[in-house]
Amino acid sequence: MDEFHRYGKEDNSRQQCFLYPLFFQEDLYAISHDHYLDGSSSSEPTEHLSSNDQFSFLTVKRLIGQIRQQNHSIVLFVNCAPNPLADCKKSSYSESVLEGLTLVLEVPFSIRSKYSVEGMNEWKSFRSIHSIFPFLEDKFPHSNYISDARIPYSIHPEILVRTFRRLIRDAPSLHPLRSVLYEYRNSPENLQRSIIVVPRVNTRFFLFLWNYYVYECESILFSLLKRSSHSRSLSHRPFPQRTHFHRKIKHIIIFSRRNSLKSIWLLKDPKINYVRYGERSIIAIKGTHLLLKKCRYYLLLFRQCYFHLWSEPYRVCSHQLSKNCSSSPGYFLRVRMNPLFVRTKMLDELFIADLITNEFDPIVPIVPILGLLAREKFCDVSGRPISKLSWTNLTDDDILNRFDQIWRNLFHYYSGSFGRDGLYRIKYILSLSCAKTLACKHKSTIRVVRKELGPELFQKSFSKEREFDSLPFSSKAAARSQRERIWHSDIPQINPLVNSWQKIQDLKIENLFDQ
């Protein structure tokens, strides 16, 4: 692999001509077999394969031949196997073939990413959920329109193969990819004409497909931002100091006020900001409504022409931030106009100036969270707490820890929003549901449970001190935390309740357009 990378660096065209012979290199499948054994979440392959069984590369080559012949008797996906215990050894070979296919397809993309790192990076994408909140705090108050777009994840397999052909000209290396995609499309779990490309499938092959697909979708926005820049030069590379560049131009043409204003206006780029998390992306625009319509039209039209699929209009929702709210990622997002009165006194005269500032205002979706708690059997549809019957077979500590974890996740995730009073209603529902669950387990009442177990158990799980354990222990700090917004850094992944709520919102929008 390193030798192939070295040849690709010397001659970039060679990366598109020598991919297919890599499928028959035994070292490649040894690496993929080790990746499969190390990254497998299930221990069934290692349990049912004895130590005397050796990995045969001849069997792997025969499987490759069966893939090329479109022989659907083999199962390339473990989840589609009718009897995974009987076909365990076959599944290990199939996963090794998929790993080998992924390793081969990753070669040209790794070379291209290496070149982009060595040169000047023109496209910087956020790679962590912790980058979303500073982006919202910094960019949203200076934007007046927002476009909430969902990446289309249902795509025909032939379109994916054609997108790979734009980079890889080695046609034989794409035949196994085409066969695998068509077999997955014809599998019993996916009986439709298109395949679903989502990041939730925890296999290297589908993660690679998703990353490549998202890269192609985001390249559309990159070209839009590149074309909208009026001050591009130096081979379309960005200026390291754009602020000083504008100041120099303004200083040079200051003698002509009319021309200078026009020139400076042309040099100012339209503020188009982009952020993505998972399958949803947000485009914040500072400009007119016509610019928003053009951006939305460009996005839909380019997706239709580039991927040869019909982009559903409801997947790109555009509205004004000061009047409407957006529901991503798990918040109701809006920009609130905050009037600020400033009084200045000069000598004996008093001047009053009214300033209006924009403030980012994320809102906690209390009603959707109550609906999700009702679905999870923590309360009824009216918000009245009920016992969690499925947890009555657990120990008291496990029950308290589970309720405590749910409340802590909710509070930490929504700690950066204004109006957190509704969260304490959620806290009351969870605490009372916890008490009813313990009472149902011990076949007694809530009063008896409190008397026997003691109130310190509930204070341990639902005390206010745990909410501010990262702050200085003072009353002023606790009072200030009620007014200020704190984005906690211990949310490496989005709350499962937020994901469920987002799915419900998507289904409501899709059903509205289907009627």
UniProtKB/Swiss-Prot annotation:
Annotated coiled-coil segments of the chain: none
One Pfam family this sequence matches: Intron_maturas2
A biological process from GO: RNA splicing
Principal subcellular localization: plastid
GO CC list: chloroplast
Domain of life: Eukaryota
Protein function: Usually encoded in the trnK tRNA gene intron. Probably assists in splicing its own and other chloroplast group II introns.
Protein name, entry field: Maturase K
Phylogenetic lineage: Eukaryota, Viridiplantae, Streptophyta, Embryophyta, Tracheophyta
Gene that this polypeptide is encoded by: matK
